[in-house]
Amino acid sequence: MYARYLDAMAAVVHFGAPSLFVTMTANPNWKEVQRSLAYDQTPKDRYDIISRVFNAKLKELLKDLEGMLGKQLAKVHVIEFQKRGLPHAHIVVILTEADRARNANHINSLSTAEIPPLPDVNDRSNLANVQRRLRALVLEHMVHNDCSGPEGRNCRCYDANKDGCSGNFPFDFCEETTTGDERQKARYRRRRGASWTATVPCDRRKSATGTRVVTNQWVVPYNAALLLKYTCHLNVEVVTVAYAIKYLFKYLFKGSDNASAAIHQTQRILDQISNYENHRYLGAAESFWRIFKFSPGQLSHTVVRMAVCFPDERCATRTLC
């Protein structure tokens, strides 16, 4: 895993800093999954189908990213499996210098963090129908869960160090997108108003009505064209911060999940070190992914590692200050 991280960093040295960070998560309600289920089955009963459909859609997405958002120089992607079961892909894309986001308008064309306004009721044009469909997809897939209030400590996104959401939700309202600088991330436009407000279902333990009102503060950045095509959670972030490069790639290559297991013996043996072992665990989705021999990740270019040691001798590394 560390060697793959170094390969990715070598691509950055050669081609330049990343331009886009894309995350795609499988949708168990994809029509390809639903029509393959038996009458008494649910998606969680057929992770083999979910893995196959996700792999096919991921290949299509990787092709689209070669030119849909700008001319691509290089990319790297890694497949990860959530503890809740659904596979997702993290993709870092390096675009040409001419296609990199340089201003607010360019960032808005690549990624937005707003709920699409609802067209007029009497407007039945194709554009209005697409707008309605996009709004429904954003509310279904691109709205962050409600992690505010005291109940937020029980949410998956809670960060004890921040005493709040690890993704910094909810964001402040912002009238215009700002590009940021080398130390500050770009801020997406998140306007305030009734046009960008909607009601979505939520956990009844947080609301007696089973609904919550969401604004642009809770929207995960997305690309409209990609969301309409793939109908799943598809986060598209524009990377403008130079110091975030190593963070992105270390996040990609952080490795698989592990679990600590305690071993209890019938006879009393005072060996506390051996009583605890660290094991990898595989969920159903990851197991099928490996059975089908799907790729766990790939770099668009081949990196040749040069040997820096004498033949038949151990390689040595040295940290440069």
Give the ranges of each region predicted by the language model.
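Extended, structured polyanion-binding interfaces
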Residues: 1-321
